[in-house]
Regions:
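Bacterial N-terminal signal peptides that target proteins for export
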Residues: 1-11
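N-terminal signal peptide c-region/cleavage motif recognized by signal peptidases
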Residues: 18-20
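N-terminal (or domain-start) structured segment
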Residues: 23-111, 150-152, 162, 172-199, ...
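An extracytoplasmic/periplasmic, membrane-proximal ligand-sensing/linker region
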Residues: 26-28, 260-322
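Hinge/capping helix and adjacent helix->loop/strand transition within the periplasmic-binding protein
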Residues: 79-85, 100-187, 236, 249-282
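Beta->alpha turn/N-cap motifs
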Residues: 89-94, 98, 185, 202-207, ...
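C-terminal lobe and pocket-closing loops
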Residues: 121, 135, 207-275, 305-308, ...
Length: 322
């Protein structure tokens, strides 16, 4: 009896050791973020990775590979093996805008990746310094259209979505701006809150806190519906401007030639994660909305539509990086 108990105990130890070794030998999945830690892309990636890892029972590591307008990180994914272990958290810039800004790129945005699934979106917020003397869009336009010299407009950098959005909106609304580029949204928003520039268009993750705290004055959301944490801010559509919805977005992409079963497995896991109330609350807490329910084909169509919209506009506005 004692011998039987001994061997059962020993077998249990061996099985546990084998399971632990198997878990340790699981190769983690990598989500590559093309911007530094702490930004919207990084936060979205980490929130989604945590939930998706639990669903897949596989660790997911978030790696930040910033530089060259997101092209360093994107190129690393384009060159990765299509084995389901490396994915790109792709945003407007590396996935679409750079194609209209740079004549030479280390990867082909249209051929180097396989779209997998949507992740999150954030509407652009139009906001001004608090001592500009306006409290709504109507008052702002009355001031901006007659201002000479033009109002100063901050952006996160030349060719950035914040820059292109601002130039586009100014042209459609009938006012001019003096563009002041910064090296990222954080210093640009800080300059606006400090009264050093007049105006900015920025995604909610980097602009919402200042708007809610009263350091800046939010005028309008560039979306088709209001955002719950800023429910008092009207949309541009409510203010009389149709078809001006502009969002900053993130999608998940795999290297080209990634097998369809791998793509579908990740698609289903991420879409399931995006339905969980805890994730939705965390995503909304940073100023994003889940971009849930997309099939790989729908993700590809979404990117293609964004490309058709923005590339001609970049050429029309004549925006080029320095």
């Amino acid at each position: 009896m004692a011998s039987s108990t001994f061997w059962k105990s020993w077998l249990g130890v061996l099985l546990l050791a084998g399971l632990q070794a198997s878990a340790q030998n699981v190769q983690p999945i990598r989500f590559i973020v093309t911007f530094p830690p702490g930004g919207a892309a990084d936060q979205v990636a980490r929130i989604v990775a945590q939930e998706t890892a639990q669903i897949l029972n596989t660790p997911i590591l978030v790696e930040n590979k910033a530089g060259a307008s997101g092209m360093i990180g994107a190129d690393s994914v384009a060159r990765a093996k299509p084995d389901g272990k490396t994915f790109l958290v792709g945003g407007n810039g590396p996935t679409v805008l750079n194609q209209g800004l740079f004549s030479k790129m280390p990867y082909d945005p249209e051929k180097s990746f396989t779209p997998v699934v949507g992740l999150a979106k954030s509407p652009m917020l139009m906001f001004v310094r608090k001592d500009l003397g306006v409290s709504n869009l109507k008052e702002f336009l009355e001031l901006a259209r007659k201002r000479n010299p033009p109002l100063s407009m901050a952006s996160a950098g030349i060719g950035n979505i914040t820059h292109i959005t601002g130039e586009y909106a100014a042209a459609l609304m009938g006012f001019k701006v003096n563009h002041i580029p910064f090296s990222g949204s954080a210093p640009a928003v800080t300059a606006l809150a400090g009264g050093n520039v007049d105006l900015m268009f920025d995604p909610l993750p980097s602009s919402m806190q200042q708007a809610r705290s009263g350091l800046t004055v939010p005028l309008a959301l560039m979306d088709d519906q209001r955002f719950p944490p800023l429910s008092q801010v009207p949309t541009l559509k409510e203010s009389g401007f149709e078809n001006m919805e502009i969002i900053a977005w993130f999608v998940l992409l795999a290297p080209a030639q990634t097998p369809a079963p791998i793509v579908m497995s990740m698609n289903k896991a991420v879409n399931l994660a995006l339905t969980r109330p805890e994730l939705i609350a965390r995503i909304q807490g940073i100023g994003e909305q889940p971009l849930a329910g997309m099939s790989p084909e729908q993700a590809a169509e979404f990117i293609a539509n964004e490309r058709q919209r923005w590339l001609p506009l970049i050429r029309q506005l004549g925006i080029k990086p320095e």
